[in-house]
């Protein structure tokens, strides 16, 4: 950066010019010191999550400052050239400082984004579903008098919102009852009635996972079709349980999909969690080894399995085998059997839940990718047709974007 500084043969200079050089050099050192001091103060105030990047910025600035100091000490005594070179040095330092400050500001912005509360991220994640429903409901809640035409419009919106026929019929009956009971008159009041009806429908799905106090590992087996987000959900769950003070071990039981093991190992490395895997062998063997390794030292085992369609009968038999092997490893295991659902598939999610529930006896669901779909009504369809508890929902790609399902928060963000 400062390659333009070169030593020159010393020449005699009048005393006045020599004093100007020294004064200029001292001024540069003072300004540089002030710049560095300001940067260090900014860096020290950063959150822990940007500490590394901030320290890198300080090192960059400090290196530049040292070069300036060395150059000042070796400056030629020729006043004119000295002043010119000092100005160039100041510009170079200012540029370096500007770049460093930019890095710090970018890091701070990233930190602030991750500090968004869950309610804000949930609202942001449900934007597509909410926007679609809001446009469709604009005519319904526009202030017109409640009548059969309005009811027909509302029914159409609910069906096209992937709530399914059974859930739609339930909601329409419930809304009509509330309108009659409370004497509601217009579309604006109808919104509140719909929100309460939808909340009552999906509230039974809100059953947070409670971990028992036991000496044996709590085993959670995850299943689902390819692409639903099982492996990613396992990585996020590991982080979630660690935040609760639990020790976690991962079983790379997806022995079919290319790079599935490597993907889970990457999540394990990210969370500092051990991953049990095999280069050969079947899913059941991997899961069994993981449970054996976890005994007496690990709180939770998260067992990944290969993606499969419910219509692939031989693969459904294989996942039943995984369950049986886990039962042999620890009586009562797996303690939780969760299917991971991609919200983008809409009504097909109900069929998947039915098939996996019939085969395995599901205890919970994880609904992912709600941020990428306009089909947020799928939870109403599940609540009406096969009400397996929704343990967690995912509304983003961040590691903290998987949280326990909250029915009230979901309805409020969907229909606000």
Curated annotation (Swiss-Prot):
SMART domains, alphabetized: AAA (SM00382), SRP54 (SM00962), SRP54_N (SM00963)
Question: What are the names of the required cofactors?
Answer: Mg(2+)
Topology in the membrane?
Peripheral membrane protein
A Pfam family that this protein carries is SRP54_N
UniProt keyword annotation of Transferase present: no
For this chain's UniProt record, which GO biological process terms are given? SRP-dependent cotranslational protein targeting to membrane
Subcellular location per the Swiss-Prot or TrEMBL entry: Cell membrane; Cytoplasm
Q: Where is the composition biased (Basic residues)?
A: 1-10
Catalytic reactions of this protein:
GTP + H2O = GDP + phosphate + H(+)
General remark: In vitro purified FtsY has been shown to bind to pilE promoter DNA in a sequence-specific manner using gel retardation assay but it cannot be explained.
Q: What exactly does this protein do?
A: Involved in targeting and insertion of nascent membrane proteins into the cytoplasmic membrane. Acts as a receptor for the complex formed by the signal recognition particle (SRP) and the ribosome-nascent chain (RNC). Interaction with SRP-RNC leads to the transfer of the RNC complex to the Sec translocase for insertion into the membrane, the hydrolysis of GTP by both Ffh and FtsY, and the dissociation of the SRP-FtsY complex into the individual components.
- Identify its protein family: Belongs to the GTP-binding SRP family. FtsY subfamily.
**Annotated protein name in UniProt:** Signal recognition particle receptor FtsY
What is the source species? Neisseria gonorrhoeae
The encoding gene is ftsY
């Amino acid at each position: 950066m400062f390659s333009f500084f070169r030593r020159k043969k010393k020449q005699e200079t009048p005393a006045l010019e020599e004093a100007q050089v020294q004064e200029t050099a001292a001024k540069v050192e003072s300004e540089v010191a002030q710049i560095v001091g300001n940067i260090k103060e900014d860096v020290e105030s950063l959150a822990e999550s940007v500490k590394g990047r901030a320290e890198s910025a300080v090192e960059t600035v400090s290196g530049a400052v040292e070069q300036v100091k060395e150059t000042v000490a070796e400056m030629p005594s020729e006043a004119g050239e000295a002043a010119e070179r000092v100005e160039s040095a100041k510009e170079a330092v200012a540029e370096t400082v500007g770049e460093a400050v930019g890095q710090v500001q970018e890091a701070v912005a990233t930190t602030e984004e991750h500090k968004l509360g869950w309610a804000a991220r949930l609202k942001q994640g449900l934007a597509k579903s909410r926007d679609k429903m809001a446009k469709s409901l604009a005519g319904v809640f526009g202030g017109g008098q409640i009548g059969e035409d309005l009811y027909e419009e509302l029914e159409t919106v609910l069906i096209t919102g992937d709530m399914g026929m059974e859930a739609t019929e339930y909601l329409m009956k419930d809304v009509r009852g509330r309108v009659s009971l409370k004497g509601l008159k217009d579309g604006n009041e109808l919104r509140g009635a719909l929100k309460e009806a939808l909340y009552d429908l999906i509230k039974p799905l809100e059953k947070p996972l409670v971990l028992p106090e036991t000496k044996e590992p709590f085993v959670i087996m995850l299943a689902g079709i390819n692409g639903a987000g099982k492996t990613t959900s396992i990585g996020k769950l590991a982080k979630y349980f660690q935040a609760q003070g639990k020790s976690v071990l991962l079983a790379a039981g997806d022995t079919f999909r290319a790079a599935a093991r490597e993907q889970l190992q990457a999540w394990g490395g990210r969370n500092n969690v051990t991953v049990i895997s095999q280069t050969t062998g079947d899913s059941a063997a991997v899961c069994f080894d993981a449970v054996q390794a976890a005994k007496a030292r690990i709180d939770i085992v998260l067992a990944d399995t290969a993606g499969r369609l419910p219509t692939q009968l031989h693969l459904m038999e294989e996942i039943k085998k995984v369950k049986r092997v886990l039962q042999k490893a620890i009586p009562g295991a797996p303690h939780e059997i969760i299917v991971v659902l991609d919200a983008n598939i809409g009504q097909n999610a109900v069929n998947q839940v039915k098939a996996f529930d019939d085969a395995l006896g599901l205890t919970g669901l994880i609904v992912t990718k709600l941020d990428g779909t306009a089909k947020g009504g799928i939870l109403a369809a599940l609540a009406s047709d096969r009400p397996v508890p929704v343990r967690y929902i995912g509304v983003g790609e961040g590691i903290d974007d998987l949280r326990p399902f909250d029915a009230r928060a979901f309805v409020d963000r969907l229909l606000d």
